[in-house]
Amino acid sequence: MGSEMCIRDRLRHAEYYDMQKTFDSLYADSKSGEVFGHLMDIISAPNNIKLAFRNIKGNDGSHTAGTDGRTIESLAVMSEDKFVKLIQKQFRRYEPKAVKRVEIPKPNGKMRPLGIPCIIDRIVQQCILQVMEPICEAKFYEHSYGFRPCRSAENAISYAYGLAQRNKLHYVVDVDVKGFFDNVDHRKLLKQIW
């Protein structure tokens, strides 16, 4: 999906569930250095939960069951009110279920482990992501492209190519730290972020 379409779809969904003004406010407050309290009120708000369902439902993986055997379809048959209450209940004492482990092939023929969370865990985590994302995005470097909303490797390549052309650079170094994400010290990483 192109970044313009991605942005348009995300905005349309957030506006439909009346969450966009909240997200814009979180972004602006974070940009100005605000310290946040009471985020659980926003995270567990019915409209944020409904938006999380909509966003997860749009993922191909929503039809793949975790260790509990449930998919998005098993939640879609519930009444909206019952579904919202089920997710809100999770926030009182949230403990994620075990993650289903599968191996998927990499382009080089080797296998890569993939974890598939239970669908309820995906919804809960999406609720948290939707609220934390505007807060964090306000602090991130504008030209950081990895694992960011509506950004891609193509965006990074385009930016790097422009820099190389403008500055008459002739060399590119490709660095891939094997297993970086699995081995990074998260305490140090969090200190760097905040």
Question: Language-model segments: which ranges?
Answer:
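Duplex nucleic acid-engaging cores and interfaces of nucleic-acid transaction enzymes
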Residues: 18, 35, 115, 119-129, ...
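N-terminal alpha-helical targeting/anchoring segments
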Residues: 8-78
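Short, small-residue-biased leader/transition segments that mark boundaries at the very start
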Residues: 1-7
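Generic, well-ordered alpha-helical scaffold segments in large soluble proteins
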Residues: 22-25, 29, 55, 59, ...
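Reverse-transcriptase-like RNA-dependent polymerase core
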Residues: 56, 86-110, 123-131, 158-167
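Short, conserved non-catalytic motifs in the polymerase core
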Residues: 60-75, 97-123, 139-152, 173-174
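Conserved catalytic palm subdomain of right-hand nucleotidyl-transferase polymerases, strongest
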Residues: 62-71, 115, 154-193
